Structure formats: C-alpha cells, structure tokens
C-alpha cells in the first residue's frame, strides 16, 4: 500500500481494466526524463522480491558494476550507532552548498533518534510521519492524568505526572517541583502508602505537614473524574469532560491558566483536535464502565500524529516509504532495514 501507484492499481482493478490497456498521456518533453539505469533497477527489483520468491536469490547472477556505483553499506551494532552514523552522513551533506539528503525509513524510533542527534548540532529536521501524539508533552500529560486518578494516586503514577513539565497545580512550576521532591523523599519511597490522597496524607510527618494543602487541592481537582471512574456505567462525554477539567486544573500555573499551557503549540493543537473529535463521536459509542476509560483513551490516541507545519531544514528530510517514491535528493539513506 505504500507504493506510489497502489491507488491507481486499485482503481484499475475495480474498473476491470488491464494496466497494459492504459494509453500514455501525450506530454511534450517526456522523452527528456533521465532513464533509470537498468542494472540498478534490476538490483532493486531483485532485492524487493516478496518473501515467497527469495529462494531465487541463490540463482541470481552477481549485479553489474553500474548497479553498485555510488552505493555504500554500513553495518551498525545497534540502533544508537545507526542513528549516529546516519546523522553524521546528513551533517556532512550540509558542507556541500546546495546538496540535499534524505533518510528513508519505516522505523519511526530510528527517525526520532536521528532527529535527536541532529538537534545536538542545532539542526531541525522534519519527519514527514510526525511524532505520535502520545509521545508529545500534551498527549503524555493527558494519558498520565487519567492514569493517576485510576491508579489511586499510586507512587509510580504520581511521580510520572508530578515530574511532567506541564504539571503545576496552580502554583509556580519551581515550587511544585520542590513539593514533588519532598513528597517523594518522605512518603513515596519505602512502604507503599494506602490508595488515594488519604494514604499520602497518612504518610506525612510533622516536618512535612506543609505539603498537606497541595495534596488537598489535588484531591479537589480529581474528585469529579475519580467519581466517574468508579461508576459501573457512565457516558463517554461525561468522562472526557471530567478528564479535561482535571487536566486543565493540573496544568495551570501561578501566572498562566491551564488551557493556555496544555493546548499551546502544534502538539497542543493536535491534542485539542483529538479531544474535539472524541467528543463529537462520544454519543455514538454509548455508555461504558468507568474503569475501562483509561484503556479506551490510550487506544483511541494510538495512531494520531503531530506533523510539523514548518521549521525544518530546507535541504534535509526524513521520509516514509510513500514520500520517498515521490521525491528526490542527492543523497538517499535507507535506514532501519
């Protein structure tokens, strides 16, 4: 399905037309398009044989010299080394004025590693596949918020969202970080506290009583969502509404409201769009048990991506399989093979 002509093939099949019967559209200058070297084309065709035909590789003759001209294979011991080598090759291209390069890979983890390596040199490179919404700050924050309440403020879930950059609970960000560190040292390490805010309050000592107001505020913020998650049957609209109310309250800082922090930037806009679509379709999904909401939210967010609109380097790119068939660069790197 990633082939550039897949859609045309499907159309011809539905129209019951043989591809050989399709006439060429007259186009002046079409003969001037450079022809692909036959040896290289044959090499790529043989390399991409379906799994059922790879046994024929043993009978294939060695590829001609022209097929291997300009090709280089780099074997790497691991994904980190592979990302480093690719980043160096991309960086080297920038030393030649006007030269372009692209990494082609179906491996999104490799793409993110390469982008991170390029960032060390201050080079922004766009991945056309985007970043999974769940791995962006707003997406992960929304997921952690529901996990926190569903998990009864368990230590692991509390620390995961407590150390998230968007979490402030209406206080200065630095002050909330200090609160989390103190709570971690005094209550969250050692024997597991009882579930809920009451369990955390019970673990406070005289020297940490000053943490109590923050915990009580968190209990008030989460009360609506907590009550719905414990219902055996509740509408998705109610759950999403309570979830977002809690997330926005948790994201608020002393000088900025929660919505302004949570929905800012491209990732925030993508998260807001996802929530809007979820609310639009919630009525058709009917009621569900509150305990299943967290899993449902994770599943629905899967596959959503945040794609950059602009800002990447004009001569470097990371392409998926379909984009690579439709574009050209002086240096093409195939990664994650």
Model-assigned labels for residue ranges:
Residues 1-337:
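Polyanion-engaging groove/track-forming segments
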